[in-house]
């Protein structure tokens, strides 16, 4: 009976997004929104504050992805939900679509031909990446979600916050719910912070990897891909 269940299970391909399939990161999205404030003075002020915070973002990301999320998404505090969602298609056309790596479509096409369910797990905001994922043909995804009160962002994320071990936990729960065999599945990421996610599938791949992830991939004989 267990063997029959195993045969019926499907496999999936789990993708990180920023740095893996596209060259942009969370700061590019924040910068885009900072330049689209109501009024010139507010736009200049918000853009300057965003630029000034980049060293802080980099430092906290090296220390802890969870701390980074707390600091980074605080920058959205006070933003109108309607405006953020309104500009999401413009964000896609002007920033995200041109940033898709040349090899991304080849990887996705091969994965789909192999019958793998396509799933993205990203630390970006849900509304900001939805048009991109539709363009890439990735129907299943989980992303971070801002908390809004009376139509304005509080600067806090709703749980679960997609980062590091949380991504791996979400994948396990998704696989259990959807009948996905993780031992037959693939995972793709560029960052060592996604090591938990890469470690739970049968076929992990380091894509455009940072130094630490590349060394880990070499030690474990994982696939190393360059989509740039």
Predicted regions and their residues:
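N-terminal alpha-helical segment
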Residues: 51, 65-68
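Active-site neighborhood of HAD-like aspartate-dependent phosphohydrolases
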Residues: 2-60
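Electropositive phosphate-/nucleotide-binding environments in soluble metabolic enzymes
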Residues: 24, 62, 66, 78, ...
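C-terminal cap/substrate-recognition subdomain and adjoining C-terminal extension
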Residues: 2-10, 86, 93-228
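Metal-dependent phosphoesterase signature
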Residues: 67-102
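Residue-level signal for pocket-adjacent positions within structured domains
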Residues: 16-17, 71, 141, 152
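Short acidic (Asp/Glu) patches
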Residues: 37, 62, 102, 106
């Amino acid at each position: 009976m267990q063997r029959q269940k195993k045969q019926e299970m499907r496999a999936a391909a789990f993708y990180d997004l920023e740095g893996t399939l596209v060259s942009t990161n969370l700061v590019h999205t924040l910068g885009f929104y900072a330049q689209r404030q109501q009024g010139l003075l507010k736009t200049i002020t918000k853009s300057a504050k965003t630029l000034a915070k980049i060293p802080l973002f980099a430092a906290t990301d090296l220390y802890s992805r969870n701390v980074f999320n707390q600091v980074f998404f605080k920058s959205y505090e006070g933003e109108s939900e309607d405006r953020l969602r309104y500009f999401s298609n413009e964000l896609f056309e002007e920033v995200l679509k041109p940033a898709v790596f040349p090899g991304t479509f080849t990887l996705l096409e091969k994965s789909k031909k192999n019958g793998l369910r396509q799933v993205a797990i990203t630390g970006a905001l849900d509304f900001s990446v939805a048009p991109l994922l539709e363009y890439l043909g990735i129907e299943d995804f989980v992303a971070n979600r801002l908390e809004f009160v009376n139509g304005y962002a509080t600067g806090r994320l709703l749980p679960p916050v997609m980062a590091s071990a949380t991504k791996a936990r979400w994948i396990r729960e998704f696989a259990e719910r959807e009948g996905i065999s993780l031992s037959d599945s693939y995972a793709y990421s560029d960052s060592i912070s996604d090591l938990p996610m890469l470690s739970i599938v049968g076929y992990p791949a380091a894509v455009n990897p940072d130094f630490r992830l590349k060394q880990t991939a070499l030690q474990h004989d994982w696939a190393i891909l360059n989509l740039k």
